[in-house]
Amino acid sequence: MSDFIINRVQMFLAEANKASVEVSDDLIEEFANACKDAFKKQFTEERETKFRYRMSNVGKPLCQLQMEQSGAEAEAMPYNAKMRNLFGDLIEAAAIIIMKASGVEVKDIQKKVQYKFDDKYINGTMDVKIGDKIYDIKSASPYSFENKFGENGGFDALKNDDPFGYLAQGYMYGEGAKSDFGGWIVINKSTGEWCTTEVPPEDSSKQEVINKAKENIKNYIKELEYLI
């Protein structure tokens, strides 16, 4: 599936370099609305101040989650961090429209999902479903594009060095959506290149990663009960 996605996107963009291409008014309107929502998200929406575990953070090291939960003051972000976040949202919005326009079957965009275990649950918002698999869209620096997701990286490199918990995030999106997690669709935010990092068919790490994330949740809840 990942080769199909990249091939269709590359053909579409190559054709757009040579001449105008067909993009429906509905897709253009969808992109405009996504850009508007991205700007509101980064600048005008009320920020969530209370820490909560979610699919996008539960795979991080437990000590980091505990620091965030305790309210420890984080290092001040540089002023341009907000621009980086906005660029990421806009690239993701463009990626979805480009895939749709190139003939990739994109569905269930930004769908809320929930994973339940024991008497607990964790929420998240998956990016897209393509075919029968869930994919996460990432914008990446040139270094990360090459060395984490691209030719010099790949699934094994990401599995061995995953401080942001990308694997746990993706696996839980899949579990919550009751579909397999396919991997990552990645756009180099400097050059515009695309690549995919596919989860291998015989993936032995899934349950181990999910179990570690569940243990993080249990320890997080236990610490809250202790503080209360």
Question: What annotation goes with each model-predicted range?
Answer:
Residues 100, 139, 175-178:
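Hydrophobic/aromatic-lined pockets within catalytic cores
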Residues 153-167:
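A short acidic, glycine-rich active-site loop
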